[in-house]
């Protein structure tokens, strides 16, 4: 408090704060933190929908900056090992490599790096967009864009320790969701049935030096081949700067979908601002998971299930999550590293063999995306 007060009275050119992510003092002119007296406002992970923000945790008497956003781990890239040519050697990477080799999986090392990296990029997009939607927040921090080599090593960057790209995302794609002006879209979920209607609430984050005098906002929806299924325009309007501004709402009926599909929702503001989001649409088989004389769907292995099997019939057993013994699965990659934050399950996503027949009606990439949320969470 004494140092902050001294700074304020001695130098009017700067703003002063007593700490980062620790105790707030009375003389603070801004506050960098994980939480305020109104609640936890830092954002470390995305959600399976985008219609949310952290405004209710804000609105205190000084500007608030969110501390250390995102920071989800990526599997080590063993190709970086030769780059450590000085007194610091990548012994930790060598330990991981030896462990993988001992378990007969060294040939999958690059796949593990790629799929975990793709998921971390996915998380950064959603985390940063949530930060931008939070209009009462004065900013956010990433610890860095590159990996942090201290504290046991935190491979959370989209750049490696040498500030080289990991090849996970291009600068142009990153700036679609992290730039002075960003198109944003609020919607309630990412997985739909074909008898539902998608509704998006468009916004624009504009902290550029200039107002947008005649902002022309367009939206369009494409399928996996890039074919445009529907498009439209929102009202042309004057958009201010230093804020988050509503653009309008649009809808799209999904009843034209007859087979499982991934669709991409696009939103542009003017000629230079563009962003996009994926959703997954499925036919609504209302008779699915219904017991018949030949097939029993059940959550418990009971006398009825045994009887079905004894009679040569089929049983589909789907135990409730709280009844299954084993490690709980999660969607998110581990935070920072398990040396500093040792909580279960310390996993880094999934390597999915997407070409297998079991995924014929479940559209997926090799890495996790938001259509997996419910499966892994429940």
Spell out what each predicted region is.
Residues 280-300:
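Low-complexity, Pro/Ser/Thr- and charge-rich linker/hinge segments at domain boundaries
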Residues 270-276:
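Short, exposed coil/turn segments at beta-strand boundaries within extracellular/luminal domains
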Residues 1-159:
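Substrate-binding/catalytic cleft of secreted carbohydrate-active enzymes
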Residues 116, 188-190, 207, 240, ...:
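Outer-membrane beta-barrel proteins
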Residues 301-377:
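A glycine-rich, often tryptophan-bearing local segment used as a flexible ligand/cofactor-contacting loop or short
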